[in-house]
């Protein structure tokens, strides 16, 4: 969704993401999609003739559902976004439970800590992921430019989980 801009007009596109909101007005449905790659989502516009319209009509596509939408990017006539997806097909990849806890409102950090598996779907979780990605990329790029070689070292853990391993001593001192 991050790359959706007016330069992509024309030709078919396919996007996948989580449903942030669903609105129905005058025989047209608007589905806002998000995938964490940008702060804003992408609005998909579906007409009653669109494949998958029944999924909206019977309420199976709701906030939190994962979907695949095919269509064409067009200039948005409404304010608030530069482009929208004129959808030709909507496919439900994963339904959301009726008691899906994330809604449009802002949630406290404590609320999100209790639902860590849903944190990446929030604006905050997506922003943190994008910042971490940019920082990791910049760090690697800097050190690569300075002639360093990246090495992924093995991890040494201090815990013996359920007796599955054998403990041993690690020291930085050289034996005499």
Residue locations for each model-derived region?
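Class II aminoacyl-tRNA synthetase catalytic cores and aaRS-like
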Residues: 1-176
